């Protein structure tokens, strides 16, 4: 069991993207920072907002890239390389079109599934895709042509409440995730639905 040393929350920078579906991962990391009572601060060296807390004697770093989504890997690779964090000790939280709002799933490895943030992270980590993912369901607009506007849009209140609930579920299993007990975390998280 590999303990998680880096949690990344994907999103786009700037007030125009706050509370959009595409920023679900960033929202998750903001909630962790709040729960741990640490402040995310800008760090140019890592192209993002960073914070650190301790869990069972281990340092856990938080990162929200301040690059645009399709350059997220630049930020992740800079921090992971500096602190010598291996891909299997990284958890990337991101929005997931293929899951309905209110559903969160953990996964290790795999492709990018069309997600530009994941695509760039895989490329910047030297084509290593063995990092963990927290997939936060946002639903699908039903037509591929509508995806861009959909992910960059704000969810209606009922959808946002479901997304918030799925983030709460994920926060509930975070101690198991941090300890590297993904089997236990997955059993618990995958049985939840808002």
From Swiss-Prot:
GO CC, one annotated term: cytoplasm
Positions of the record's site feature: Discriminates between blocked and unblocked aminoacyl-tRNA: 12
Annotated localization: Cytoplasm
RNA-binding among keywords: yes
Superkingdom, taxonomy of origin: Bacteria
Primary location class: cytoplasm
Pfam family, one: Pept_tRNA_hydro
Top-level EC class as recorded in UniProt: hydrolase
Gene Ontology MF: a single term: peptidyl-tRNA hydrolase activity
PROSITE patterns: PEPT_TRNA_HYDROL_1, PEPT_TRNA_HYDROL_2
CDD domains named in the record: PTH (cd00462)
EC number(s) from the headed UniProt entry: 3.1.1.29
Active site: 22
Positions annotated to bind tRNA: 17, 68, 70, 116
Gene3D superfamilies: Peptidyl-tRNA hydrolase (3.40.50.1470)
Keyword set, alphabetical order: Cytoplasm, Hydrolase, RNA-binding, tRNA-binding
InterPro entries: Pept_tRNA_hydro (IPR001328), Pept_tRNA_hydro_CS (IPR018171), Pept_tRNA_hydro_sf (IPR036416)
Site residues (Stabilizes the basic form of H active site to accept a proton), renumbered to this chain: 95
Function: Hydrolyzes ribosome-free peptidyl-tRNAs (with 1 or more amino acids incorporated), which drop off the ribosome during protein synthesis, or as a result of ribosome stalling.
Entry's family note: Belongs to the PTH family.
Alphabetical list of HAMAP family matching this protein: Pept_tRNA_hydro_bact (MF_00083)
Quaternary structure note: Monomer.
PANTHER family: PEPTIDYL-TRNA HYDROLASE
Protein name in UniProt: Peptidyl-tRNA hydrolase
Provenance organism: Pseudomonas putida (strain W619)
């Amino acid at each position: 069991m590999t303990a998680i040393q880096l949690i990344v929350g994907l999103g786009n920078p700037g007030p125009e993207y706050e509370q959009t579906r595409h920023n679900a991962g960033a929202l998750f990391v903001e909630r962790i920072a709040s729960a741990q009572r640490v402040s995310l601060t800008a760090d140019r060296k890592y192209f993002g907002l960073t914070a650190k807390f301790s869990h069972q004697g281990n340092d856990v770093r938080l990162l929200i890239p301040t690059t645009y989504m399709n350059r997220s890997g630049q930020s992740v690779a800079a921090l992971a390389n500096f602190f010598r964090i291996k891909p299997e000790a990284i958890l990337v939280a991101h929005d997931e079109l293929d899951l309905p709002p209110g559903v969160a799933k953990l996964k290790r490895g795999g492709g990018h599934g069309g997600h530009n943030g994941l695509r760039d992270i895989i490329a910047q980590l030297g084509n290593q895709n063995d990092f963990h993912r927290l997939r936060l369901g946002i639903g699908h607009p039903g037509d591929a042509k509508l995806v861009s506007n959909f992910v960059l849009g704000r969810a209606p209140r009922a959808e946002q409440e479901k997304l918030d609930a799925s983030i709460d579920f994920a926060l509930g299993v975070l101690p198991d995730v941090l300890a590297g007990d993904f089997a236990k975390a997955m059993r618990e998280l995958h049985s939840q639905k808002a």
